[in-house]
């Protein structure tokens, strides 16, 4: 897509004058999102959300169901990126105790195949979910992860059928999430 990127993200510790990758695991990260208190950073790797806790130098896996062309956590599908110009659907509460995110189930969205040139002499194929007019879109749901209890809860959105959630943000009250 045009706006999303994958990269190796680095953390620079000013006090120790030390630079290291935000994750020791293989794979690049997407949409690093720092907590308001600066002690954590949430990011997406392989369609799953992870949190790096800087104070303890640990990495916590928030979601485990992410899968290419099926489930996206925290990042957006093609429609949201192209039509709403949004790639990040994760938000920290003001007290840094909760991480809200949108989950996309694109398993019923038809696949589109496109030729892509890479390192080889001939192009390969890139397959991704692309709903044409009249086809099914991703099913979206909003979730909240507690950093303290490590529980994830699905939040009930009072809308039925096909709908979009292009923005989420916590209000100044850490118990209120605005879903737009």
Question: Model-predicted segments: where are they?
Answer:
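Beta-propeller folds
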Residues: 1-180
